[in-house]
Amino acid sequence: MTNPQGRFRGLFIPHVTPFGDDGVLDLESLERLTTHQTSIHGVAGLVSCARIGEGPVLGLEEKQRVYEVAGKVARKAGKLHIATIAPQSTDEAIRLIRDLENLPVDAVMIFPPLLLAWGKVESELKFRFFEDITRATSMPLVLFQIPVKSYWYDPATICRIAGLNNVVAFKEASFDIDLFTETMKQLERAKASMEVLSGNDRFVAESYRLGAAGALIGVANVATEKWAAMDLAAQQGDFDRAAALQKELEAVKEIVFREPIVEAVARIKIVLQHEGLIKTATVRRPQLGVSAEERKLLLDSYHALKKTGFRSSDSVAMAS
């Protein structure tokens, strides 16, 4: 890919992976869902097999099929497609990325290996992990700061990784505003060309004001048009408008990412099934899904929010 830097801007949706009642991949629903999402003005691209896409419980062959379907849909719509991998070694990362080179994939987002959370890990190990990958493949890469402190990359290490040729973007989802701010400052001083995509849905609008090029947030599977409008406002420099839209969307986030957060995928799928975009809301174990009572509360709250144009209000917030 020529000059990939600069393309990874805007709203990226880590889509869910639909299953049938029997737990088998539902590729028909996947195509319908991703076709809808990529048709929305302001959506820059799709992200496959991330946490929202239940990547950790998908087999390699299943992931390949998801990458193919979502990638073809994205290409047809003129949008970008990012595949997610979770390698545990450098060799595995290189092998997985090479397997993607002939698929409709524009970049690969890499979950940090478990080793990075094993006690105090030297920054050189984290840097060399990416350096070795970039020497073995030309595939554009997306660095991922997950919301688990023991895995974090410090700002100086991020700047070093950003200097590698094919590291094109960074999903910053630490949910730590101080770390995010310091990282943005150091990247600016380093004149890094790597784009920053905010995964911090608590302060995504503020992320734009601090220099983020876009957002990569699972909650955007619900009320996608409004999240896209927030992104477009920020892209146009209207940060006050973006902040106002985020405030209106707070109730959407609350009905999806309430505790237990691990069931957020199930809640998103319930809404998408209700909207006719996927056939079932089936999730894979060890996720348990939600009770019939919570399902009713969720859809009641969703209906109320939808009637208001997804504006946050005490009268439509889900009962605790």
Regions found by a protein language model. Give the residues of each.
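C-terminal alpha-helical cap/extension of soluble enzyme domains
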Residues: 7, 12-18, 36-43, 51, ...
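Generic alpha-helical structural signal
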Residues: 31, 64, 68, 94, ...
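Glycine-centered loop/turn motif at secondary-structure junctions
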Residues: 41-42, 78, 104, 165, ...
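A general structural signal for well-ordered alpha-helical segments in protein cores
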Residues: 30, 67, 93, 130, ...
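Alpha-helix N-capping/helix-start residues
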Residues: 21, 27, 60, 155, ...
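Catalytic alpha/beta core domains of metabolic enzymes, predominantly
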Residues: 132-135, 147-253, 257-260
